[in-house]
Amino acid sequence: LECKDLGISIDDDNNRRLAVKEGDPLVVQFVNADREGN
């Protein structure tokens, strides 16, 4: 495994995404929690 640029971005809906930049920008959403009740 090579070292890759990793970044975590949080959008307005409080969804956390792991952004992996490997050639083409690739965004993997690993948290999608609807928190309407909170």
From Swiss-Prot:
Belongs to the protease inhibitor I3 (leguminous Kunitz-type inhibitor) family. This is Trypsin inhibitor DE5 beta chain. Inhibition of trypsin. The keyword Transmembrane does not apply. Gene3D superfamilies: 2.80.10.50. Heterodimer of an alpha and a beta chain linked by a disulfide bond. The lineage of its organism: Eukaryota, Viridiplantae, Streptophyta, Embryophyta, Tracheophyta. It comes from the Eukaryota. GO terms for molecular function: serine-type endopeptidase inhibitor activity. Signal peptide: none annotated.
